[in-house]
Amino acid sequence: MVRRFKRAVKYRRGSRTHGWGRVGQHRKSGGSGGKGMVGFHKHKWSLVMKYGESGTGWPFYGKHGFKQPQAISIEWRPINVGTLAEVVRGLKREGRVKEEGGRYVVNLVELGFNKLLGGGDVDLPIVVYTPAASRSAVEKIEKAGGEVRIVPAVHR
Protein backbone atom coordinates (compact mmCIF):
# COMPACT_ATOMS: atom_id res chain seq x y z
CA MET A 1 0.00 0.00 0.00
CA VAL A 2 0.99 3.58 -0.45
CA ARG A 3 2.15 5.29 2.71
CA ARG A 4 0.46 8.64 3.40
CA PHE A 5 3.13 9.98 5.74
CA LYS A 6 6.84 9.43 6.03
CA ARG A 7 7.97 7.38 8.99
CA ALA A 8 9.31 9.47 11.88
CA VAL A 9 12.69 7.78 11.69
CA LYS A 10 13.21 9.30 8.25
CA TYR A 11 12.97 12.77 9.76
CA ARG A 12 15.37 11.82 12.55
CA ARG A 13 18.19 10.57 10.35
CA GLY A 14 21.35 12.47 11.11
CA SER A 15 20.27 13.62 14.58
CA ARG A 16 22.41 11.12 16.54
CA THR A 17 19.98 10.49 19.44
CA HIS A 18 16.69 10.56 17.48
CA GLY A 19 15.02 12.74 20.08
CA TRP A 20 15.98 10.69 23.17
CA GLY A 21 18.01 13.29 25.00
CA ARG A 22 21.63 14.25 25.30
CA VAL A 23 23.78 11.19 25.95
CA GLY A 24 23.09 7.46 26.08
CA GLN A 25 19.39 7.42 26.81
CA HIS A 26 16.71 5.09 25.43
CA ARG A 27 18.79 1.98 25.75
CA LYS A 28 17.74 -1.28 27.33
CA SER A 29 20.00 -2.48 30.15
CA GLY A 30 23.22 -1.26 28.63
CA GLY A 31 22.99 2.13 30.24
CA SER A 32 22.80 0.73 33.77
CA GLY A 33 25.51 -1.92 33.63
CA GLY A 34 23.19 -4.88 33.11
CA LYS A 35 19.90 -6.22 34.41
CA GLY A 36 19.30 -7.01 38.06
CA MET A 37 22.27 -8.27 40.06
CA VAL A 38 24.52 -8.61 37.04
CA GLY A 39 27.99 -7.29 37.76
CA PHE A 40 27.83 -7.38 41.55
CA HIS A 41 31.09 -9.35 41.56
CA LYS A 42 32.61 -7.17 38.85
CA HIS A 43 31.85 -3.57 37.96
CA LYS A 44 29.10 -3.05 40.59
CA TRP A 45 31.17 -4.34 43.53
CA SER A 46 31.35 -0.86 45.06
CA LEU A 47 27.54 -0.87 45.37
CA VAL A 48 27.68 -4.18 47.22
CA MET A 49 30.25 -2.81 49.65
CA LYS A 50 28.40 0.48 50.08
CA TYR A 51 24.87 -0.85 50.59
CA GLY A 52 25.61 -4.34 51.93
CA GLU A 53 25.79 -4.99 55.64
CA SER A 54 29.17 -4.10 57.18
CA GLY A 55 31.14 -4.83 54.04
CA THR A 56 30.13 -8.50 53.91
CA GLY A 57 27.93 -8.27 50.85
CA TRP A 58 24.76 -9.31 52.70
CA PRO A 59 21.90 -9.38 51.54
CA PHE A 60 23.30 -9.79 48.05
CA TYR A 61 25.39 -12.91 48.63
CA GLY A 62 25.27 -16.02 50.77
CA LYS A 63 22.49 -18.20 52.07
CA HIS A 64 19.79 -16.70 54.27
CA GLY A 65 17.58 -18.42 56.80
CA PHE A 66 17.13 -22.15 57.07
CA LYS A 67 15.00 -24.93 55.70
CA GLN A 68 13.26 -27.05 58.29
CA PRO A 69 14.13 -30.75 58.02
CA GLN A 70 11.35 -32.92 56.65
CA ALA A 71 11.68 -35.25 59.64
CA ILE A 72 10.35 -32.63 62.06
CA SER A 73 8.05 -30.57 59.83
CA ILE A 74 4.31 -31.07 60.22
CA GLU A 75 2.10 -31.53 57.20
CA TRP A 76 -1.23 -30.05 58.23
CA ARG A 77 -4.37 -31.57 56.74
CA PRO A 78 -7.17 -29.33 58.05
CA ILE A 79 -10.94 -29.54 57.79
CA ASN A 80 -13.51 -26.86 58.60
CA VAL A 81 -16.39 -27.50 60.99
CA GLY A 82 -18.91 -26.79 58.22
CA THR A 83 -17.34 -29.44 56.00
CA LEU A 84 -17.11 -31.81 58.96
CA ALA A 85 -20.87 -31.47 59.54
CA GLU A 86 -21.51 -32.48 55.91
CA VAL A 87 -19.09 -35.42 56.23
CA VAL A 88 -20.84 -36.58 59.42
CA ARG A 89 -24.23 -36.42 57.67
CA GLY A 90 -22.82 -38.57 54.85
CA LEU A 91 -21.31 -41.06 57.31
CA LYS A 92 -24.63 -41.17 59.18
CA ARG A 93 -26.46 -42.09 55.96
CA GLU A 94 -23.95 -44.89 55.36
CA GLY A 95 -24.15 -46.01 58.98
CA ARG A 96 -20.41 -45.52 59.57
CA VAL A 97 -20.57 -43.09 62.50
CA LYS A 98 -20.94 -44.03 66.18
CA GLU A 99 -23.42 -42.36 68.52
CA GLU A 100 -22.61 -41.74 72.16
CA GLY A 101 -25.31 -40.19 74.33
CA GLY A 102 -27.13 -38.59 71.40
CA ARG A 103 -23.89 -37.16 69.97
CA TYR A 104 -21.94 -38.35 66.95
CA VAL A 105 -18.36 -39.48 67.61
CA VAL A 106 -15.77 -38.69 64.93
CA ASN A 107 -12.03 -39.35 64.92
CA LEU A 108 -10.41 -36.94 62.46
CA VAL A 109 -7.17 -38.94 62.22
CA GLU A 110 -9.11 -41.94 60.91
CA LEU A 111 -10.72 -39.65 58.32
CA GLY A 112 -7.29 -38.39 57.20
CA PHE A 113 -7.28 -34.97 58.88
CA ASN A 114 -5.17 -33.64 61.73
CA LYS A 115 -6.57 -30.17 62.45
CA LEU A 116 -10.05 -28.76 62.93
CA LEU A 117 -10.67 -25.19 61.75
CA GLY A 118 -13.63 -22.90 62.42
CA GLY A 119 -14.92 -22.17 58.91
CA GLY A 120 -18.63 -22.69 58.29
CA ASP A 121 -21.46 -23.59 60.63
CA VAL A 122 -22.26 -26.79 62.47
CA ASP A 123 -25.67 -27.76 63.82
CA LEU A 124 -25.00 -31.37 64.83
CA PRO A 125 -23.79 -32.39 68.30
CA ILE A 126 -20.42 -33.95 67.47
CA VAL A 127 -17.67 -35.31 69.71
CA VAL A 128 -14.46 -34.75 67.74
CA TYR A 129 -11.14 -36.45 68.47
CA THR A 130 -8.37 -34.41 66.84
CA PRO A 131 -4.69 -33.60 67.39
CA ALA A 132 -5.27 -29.84 66.97
CA ALA A 133 -8.19 -27.43 66.78
CA SER A 134 -8.62 -23.69 66.49
CA ARG A 135 -10.36 -21.72 69.21
CA SER A 136 -13.27 -20.77 66.93
CA ALA A 137 -13.77 -24.41 65.92
CA VAL A 138 -13.97 -25.48 69.57
CA GLU A 139 -16.48 -22.71 70.32
CA LYS A 140 -18.72 -23.66 67.38
CA ILE A 141 -18.68 -27.37 68.22
CA GLU A 142 -19.50 -26.67 71.88
CA LYS A 143 -22.26 -24.23 70.90
CA ALA A 144 -23.88 -27.01 68.85
CA GLY A 145 -23.81 -29.31 71.88
CA GLY A 146 -20.66 -31.22 71.00
CA GLU A 147 -17.16 -31.50 72.38
CA VAL A 148 -13.59 -31.39 71.09
CA ARG A 149 -11.10 -33.79 72.62
CA ILE A 150 -7.44 -33.22 71.81
CA VAL A 151 -5.49 -36.44 71.30
CA PRO A 152 -1.76 -36.86 70.70
CA ALA A 153 -0.92 -37.91 67.17
CA VAL A 154 2.18 -38.75 65.21
CA HIS A 155 2.45 -36.32 62.33
CA ARG A 156 3.37 -37.33 58.78
Swiss-Prot record:
Disulfide bonds: none annotated. GO terms for cellular component: cytosolic large ribosomal subunit. Pfam families: Ribosomal_L27A (PF00828). The keyword RNA-binding applies. It comes from the Archaea. Residues 1-16 have a biased composition (Basic residues). Residues 1-35 are annotated as: Disordered. Keywords: Ribonucleoprotein, Ribosomal protein, RNA-binding, rRNA-binding. Transmembrane segments: none annotated. One of its GO terms (molecular function) is rRNA binding. PROSITE patterns: RIBOSOMAL_L15. One of its GO terms (biological process) is translation. InterPro entries: Rbsml_uL15_N (IPR027386), Ribosomal_uL15 (IPR030878), Ribosomal_uL15/eL18 (IPR021131), Ribosomal_uL15/eL18_sf (IPR036227), Ribosomal_uL15_CS (IPR001196). Binds to the 23S rRNA. Belongs to the universal ribosomal protein uL15 family. Part of the 50S ribosomal subunit. This is Large ribosomal subunit protein uL15.
